[in-house]
């Protein structure tokens, strides 16, 4: 994809979120099912206690049904490890609210970044300290800046990005985001991302084909301006409410993992979310250097 097209798609998506922030946020109140396993996998890799409902890296409950023996001992001793989290494209900060129940025996501090202040303003009810920063991540990447130049968060224990990578146009930029998330964590720190596979759902796939054709014509974008897996999706039948989204094939997921394999090891990968439990592919990585 050429950078001119990428800029257009970036602007279309930014305009969508600013205009539809309230209605979009209203549909994003509950945690995604995949988050539970992501946090459990990262906590286990980091040796952090307090995984939600005692899940192990593979989502299996500990024998006591709680957070495991180490969590109980830590809680009894009054030990609360500090855990720092970087959330790229935080939206309405619902992941930060989820962390309170996911890591009940840890002192969590979050650094959150998004380009849509209207979404973040709808947060409220936060029980952990959160430093929020407004930044046009995709626009900065298109301009050539590395991710670490687009925010001011310190290196953290965990870096996550959920529901964002499918808005990043072009495989090269998506690799740069994943690289930047690895940069954001300390040595041994963990990264978790979700990769949307919406075209595996026949209903969503049919809608995507219709809205993509309509939006492409309205925006004057030829079919060959897009990469394979690229679509312009609608929103609640609102006229002109389009956002750029990329469907991740299994082959591209493998390429993403390979692209960062010298810097991070794959801790876990799985599918979750949606009615069939397979709307998102998740990757959990641990930084080795």
Language-model segments: which ranges?
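Structural motif
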Residues: 148-151, 183
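Class I (Rossmann-like) S-adenosyl-L-methionine-dependent methyltransferase catalytic domain
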Residues: 1-58, 64-149, 172, 190-289
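A short, conserved alpha-helix within the catalytic core of class I
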Residues: 168-180
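Short catalytic micro-motifs in class I SAM-dependent methyltransferases
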Residues: 163-167
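Local beta-strand N-terminus motif with an aromatic residue
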Residues: 82, 155-156
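Conserved helix-to-beta-strand junction in the class I
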Residues: 180-187
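A conserved beta-strand element that flanks and buttresses the S-adenosyl-L-methionine
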Residues: 160
């Amino acid at each position: 994809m050429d950078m001119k097209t990428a800029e257009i798609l970036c602007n279309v998506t930014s305009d969508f979120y600013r205009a539809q922030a309230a209605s979009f946020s209203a549909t994003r109140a509950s945690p995604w099912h995949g988050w539970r396993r992501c946090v459990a996998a990262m906590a286990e890799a980091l040796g952090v206690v307090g995984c939600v409902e005692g899940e192990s890296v593979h989502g299996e409950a500990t024998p006591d049904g709680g957070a495991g023996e180490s969590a109980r001992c830590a809680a009894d001793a009054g030990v609360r490890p500090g855990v720092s989290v970087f959330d790229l494209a935080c939206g309405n900060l619902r992941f930060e609210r989820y962390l309170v129940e996911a890591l009940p025996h840890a002192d969590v501090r979050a650094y959150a970044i998004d380009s849509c202040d209207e979404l973040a303003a709808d947060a409220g009810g936060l029980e952990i300290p959160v430093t929020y920063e407004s930044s046009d991540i995709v626009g900065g990447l298109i301009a050539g800046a590395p991710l670490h130049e687009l925010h001011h968060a310190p290196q953290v224990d965990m870096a996550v990005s959920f529901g964002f990578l499918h808005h990043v146009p072009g495989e090269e930029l998506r690799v740069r985001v994943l690289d930047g998330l690895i940069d954001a964590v300390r040595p041994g720190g963990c990264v978790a991302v979700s990769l949307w596979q919406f075209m595996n759902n026949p209903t969503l796939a049919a809608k995507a084909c219709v809205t993509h054709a309509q939006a492409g014509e309205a925006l004057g974008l030829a079919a060959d301006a897009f990469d394979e897996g690229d679509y312009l999706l609608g929103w609640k039948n609102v006229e002109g409410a389009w956002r750029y989204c990329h469907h991740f094939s299994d082959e591209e997921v493998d390429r993403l993992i390979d692209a960062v394999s010298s810097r991070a090891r794959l801790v876990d990968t799985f599918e979750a979310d949606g009615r069939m439990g397979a709307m998102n592919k998740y990757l959990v990585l641990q930084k080795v250097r």
